[in-house]
């Protein structure tokens, strides 16, 4: 259901409708008790990603491509 990045440090989300729900679902599946959301990752040289609050590790789950501007 969720696509792992090649380094397995985060989930990627494809350019599909409902990417915001994907972020919510991916974070929930990863153990986050709070709602995940999209945020910009440009300062880190990465595409937009899903942020999962209050997780000790793997806090960022990625979006990419056309979705990046929507993740700001």
From Swiss-Prot:
Residues 1-72 form the LCN-type CS-alpha/beta domain. InterPro entries: LCN-type_CS_alpha_beta_dom (IPR044062), Scorpion_toxin-like_sf (IPR036574), Scorpion_toxinL/defensin (IPR002061). Keywords: Disulfide bond, Ion channel impairing toxin, Neurotoxin, Secreted, Toxin, Voltage-gated sodium channel impairing toxin. The gene is phtx3. One of its GO terms (molecular function) is toxin activity. The keyword Lipoprotein does not apply. It is found in: Secreted. Expressed by the venom gland. This is Phaiodotoxin-3. GO terms for cellular component: extracellular space. It holds the Pfam family Toxin_3. Has the structural arrangement of an alpha-helix connected to antiparallel beta-sheets by disulfide bonds (CS-alpha/beta). Sodium channel (Nav) specific neurotoxin. Disulfide bonds join 13-38, 23-50, 27-52, 63-71. Belongs to the long (4 C-C) scorpion toxin superfamily. Sodium channel inhibitor family.
């Amino acid at each position: 259901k969720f696509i792992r990045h090649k380094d397995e440090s985060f989930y990627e989300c494809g350019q599909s409708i409902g990417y915001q729900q994907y972020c919510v679902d991916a974070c929930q599946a990863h153990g986050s008790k709070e709602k995940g959301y999209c945020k910009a990752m440009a300062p880190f040289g990465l595409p937009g990603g899903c942020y999962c609050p209050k997780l000790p590790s793997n806090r960022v789950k990625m979006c990419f491509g056309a979705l990046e501007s929507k993740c700001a």
